[in-house]
Amino acid sequence: MISESKKYFNENGYVVIQNFLKPEIYCLLYEYMKNKARRELIKQISPKSSHLYDKDLDGSFIDEQAPGAFSLYGDPLMDAVLQNSKDFISNIIEVDLIPTYSYWRLYITNNELKKHKDRPSCEYSTTLCIGYDTSNVEEEKYNWPIYIKSHNGEVKSVMLNPGDMVIYKGCDVEHWRNNFKGLNHAQVFLHYNNKNGK
């Protein structure tokens, strides 16, 4: 499996790993992310606590790539996921990795992720599906795809269920999401560089 994943990754610039997280882990992270976003929204709008708000420490609803989504850099819990996932990801892609940073977003209705490539600190990245609420959508089993333009220029629609992740070459492959129809969708991004790189 590892050699097949590595081959696919090298040929396409990405690879999907199903069931990376167990349900008890992704369910806990999903509740944490929803509660954190809710708490920070209250902190920002409440006259009693708005002076306590710090965008860099508490997160923000202002994200250039996904306007309106709540996002947070370097959450200590997600940094633990970043560190503890490194060896598994290194084994899959056969690259000695060094963690650079974690980032997470809680998307809401009509959010999109603009088409982009990642910055140099994201040579090897993952987007990890934590959970989503699409109970407002009539389409049965609605799943919000991430689009990835593979090395050969072909655009692939990648569906992730909670616990699944896609590992991709963040600086090399364009990726994006169209408008989200559901109520919320939680994703964690784990970013790494080649330990022996430039």
Q: For each predicted feature, which ranges?
A:
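A short local loop/turn or secondary-structure capping micro-motif enriched for an aromatic residue
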Residues: 25-26, 123, 176
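Catalytic core of non-heme Fe(II) oxygenases with the double-stranded beta-helix
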Residues: 109-172, 184-188, 194-198
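Short proline/glycine-enriched turn/loop segments at secondary-structure junctions
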Residues: 177-182
